[in-house]
Amino acid sequence: MPTKDDLTYPVSLTPPDISAYRAGNIGVEYVHQFDSGKPGPHVMISAVVHGNELCGAIAVDHLLKNEARPLHGKLTMAFMNVAAYKSFDAENPSASRYVDEDFNRLWTQEVLKGNRDSVELRRAREVKPVLDTVDLLLDIHSMQTATMPLMMAGPLDKGRKFAKQMGIPEIVVMDFGHKAGRRMREYEGFSDPDSPKNALLIECGQNWEKSSSELAITAAWRFLWILGMISEETAATHLRVQPPTQQRFVEVSGPYTIKTEEFSFVEPYVGLEEISAAGTVIGYDGNQAVKTPYDNCVLIMPSLRQLPGDSALRFGKYI
């Protein structure tokens, strides 16, 4: 069920009908791949890792309808957690984040090759052979709360440089992910400092705001442009959001992982609040006060889903 806070956000987006893309073209449903026949990287843009994050589906639908094709290398466009996406209901919009478990906490070989079973794991195992060959990934997401868009670049220098190359959005977060499991952007070589593979995860704004779809479309075409997969002229016809004059980078020290079923914040944080003093109480986990670990602490993506084992938020600092 949605939380009370979810209900304060109207659903201003309509999920596109993606049934026409079901067959795919490489033997994996809802995955389309185009090969230029020329040397170059395998680039992938993925959507609906979480089924209630509509902007990615809108962006990939836009790419496919406008026949995005690579000038070199290969381009894959994929709808990931389709089962969750198909269950989206505007009257209960948070319920379709996943069916059985979070699709974006499964991305280790141990989990993917293990004995567990779920709707999300079955789908992850289907798309794994495709992801294994991807060199550069843009994974499109959105957020529960109405805060500024974020580029989640990971803790490595290669991620920071990739985010800087993208140039959007203004805020780049250098983070370590979640204790509950590894994200797709951290899969294998993406999180290996010695691998040329690289991945970005963009959070385009609040889940159902129209602006999130505008940024998602812009990010998808801009990603292809900066990699030379399409021409500047092609990209220019689809770019809807101007890049900031300067990006700001937040280095994350880690998440706060919820321990009890009685977690709550002391204020309705939405994210990017900068708390001046270390030791400021921002919430309670049962009887334990949750405090900022250092001065000028930036609160990253405070969660409305407050379950034991989940990340309540991440702590960071502008660098």
Can you name each region flagged by the protein language model?
Residues M1-I319:
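Structured catalytic-domain cores with a bias toward divalent-metal coordination
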